């Protein structure tokens, strides 16, 4: 009886093999679909915005954008502060703001941009910028012209909106000294700006992945 039982059992198993194979195909296809969906859903949008008269802050902004773009799954919007729309602002997962140093502070154009978050775009009382990533960069003529103070005022405005601020390139962000022995923006300063962009993109992706769990 034992050989007969073994043969019958094996025959029964063989009849179920097509069904098992089909189930495995469906399972694997489902896993692939979830993988594609996860990759799409974790794509992050990063707004890099700035004010620039001489072109120095604009060069830094372009480097920040390039650094962010080097991280996979990112969509970059690069605009001057006066061109940013409510859609640009509220659809972004991260906002990086750059300003030249004016009297040890952000420029009037950048200050007006932050004021417009409420007066033009209406961020309150819902705190529409809450948990978005924020970062700053700046340019100034001299070493002690107020670059750190300018970045801190930008970050303070972001913190007031319950954003998550990050640094990169330097302690408070990326900066460039545009006069003296190295006029304009040099390669080292552009590298710091790119590093800031990459850091913002990396953190924004981590936050977005965590929010989907």
Give the predicted meaning of each segment:
Residues 62-74, 159-160:
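Short helix-loop-beta junction
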Residues 44-68:
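N-terminal beta1-alpha1 ligand-phosphate binding loop
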Residues 2-21:
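Bacterial N-terminal signal peptides that target proteins for export
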Residues 35-37:
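Boundary at the C-terminal end of the N-terminal hydrophobic targeting segment
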Residues 19-31:
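Bacterial N-terminal signal peptides
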Residues 40, 166-213:
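Glycine-rich phosphate/pyrophosphate-binding loop and the adjoining helix
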Residues 82-168:
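Helix-loop-strand module that forms the ligand-binding subsite of alpha/beta enzymes
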Residues 73-83:
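A short beta-strand-loop structural module common to alpha/beta enzyme folds
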């Amino acid at each position: 009886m034992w050989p007969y039982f073994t043969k019958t059992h094996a025959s029964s198993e063989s009849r179920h093999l097509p069904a098992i194979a089909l189930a495995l195909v469906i399972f694997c296809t489902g896993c692939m679909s979830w993988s594609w969906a996860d990759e799409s859903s974790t794509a992050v949008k990063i707004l890099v915005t700035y004010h620039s008269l001489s072109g120095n802050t604009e060069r830094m902004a372009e480097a920040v954008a390039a650094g962010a773009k080097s991280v996979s799954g990112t969509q970059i919007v690069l605009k001057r502060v006066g061109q940013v729309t409510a859609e640009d602002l509220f659809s972004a997962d991260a906002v990086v703001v750059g300003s030249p140093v004016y009297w040890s502070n952000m420029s009037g154009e950048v200050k007006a941009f932050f004021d417009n978050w409420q007066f033009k775009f209406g961020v309150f009382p819902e705190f529409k910028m809450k948990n978005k990533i924020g970062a700053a960069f700046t340019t100034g003529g001299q070493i002690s012209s107020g670059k750190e103070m300018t970045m801190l005022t930008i970050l303070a405005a972001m913190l007031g909106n319950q954003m998550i601020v990050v640094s990169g390139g330097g302690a408070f962000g990326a900066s460039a000294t545009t006069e003296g022995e190295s006029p304009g923006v040099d390669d080292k300063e552009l590298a710091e700006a790119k590093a800031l962009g990459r850091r913002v993109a990396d953190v924004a992706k981590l936050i977005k992945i965590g929010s989907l769990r």
